[in-house]
Amino acid sequence: MNAPGTAPMDTTPFRARRARLLQRMQAAGGGVAILPTAPERVRNRDAHYAYRHDSYFYYLSAFREPEAVVVLVAGKETKQILFCREKNEEREIWDGYRWGPEAARAAFGFDEAWTIGDLEKRLPDYLADQPLLWTSLGYDNDWDAKVLGALNAVRDKARTGLTPPHSVRDLRAELDEMRLVKDASELATMRQAARISAAAHCRAMRATRPGRHEYEIEAELLHAFRAAGSQAPAYTSIVAGGANACVLHYVDNDQRLNDGDLLLIDAGCELEGYASDITRTFPVSGRFTGAQRDVYQLVLDAQAAAVGATRAGNTFMAPHEAAVAVLAQGLIDLG
């Protein structure tokens, strides 16, 4: 855990992304962008699921707390605003450190920061006389209601000369375009996530033998992920022995591993919001049968063809088509 009052990482890339988004908004006519993080979810009674921030929100903010919203104003003068939870000594005793607006503004590089309770009051002021509203509607009914409430609050002041934005742009679509090209910090994080996951798969392979259970191998993966510093699995791990591997999203992971079967593992860690994803299949006993080896080699050849077709200038589908061609011919050859 980072010491209270210090940012969790270098926030320079996040500030640069906000500045780049503001430039794109200005080029499209200006306006205001509003982006909330993910809500907390109750697991049972007073227990919550482990919190995970919204990816789009984190991409711009580096801020991991729930109950937070980023507002970006792309006018003649740009403005970057963060709304977050207020400092609360009692809740921090229960739940841990909270940044609070003042410390968060300085640490994460925002021009202004306010408590999340101020959002409803201040949002109409940011929206007034702006040409465009950049947000994403249709994903969360509660959030949609807050946005519509703010727009209606501006409309209610029409007699004073204020006007609301005349149209809404999909903010996620704009951010998707930005996220297609990774910056240096993203690439470094993704490579480290891949290294952690590759080492976890090797650990799982070494631990596999007939008589063990799928969940025991899953535990090896989870141990390796967390011990290397990742925050969580990127998705529920698939550890599927024998026929279970034919279920595309098998997650029970509770069956015994048998001699002669293959074990499929589809698992990867998440590191600083970035996912890794690795799938490997290998013999439970450590040695392929003849038929298993033939099919394994065919899949490996298809993967090599796909990798070879992954290069600048090719279409998105080129790697897939290269793999399909190898698989189709290989299956014919195998009879």
Give residue spans per PLM region.
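Active-site neighborhoods and metal-handling regions in enzymes and metal-associated proteins
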Residues: M1-G335
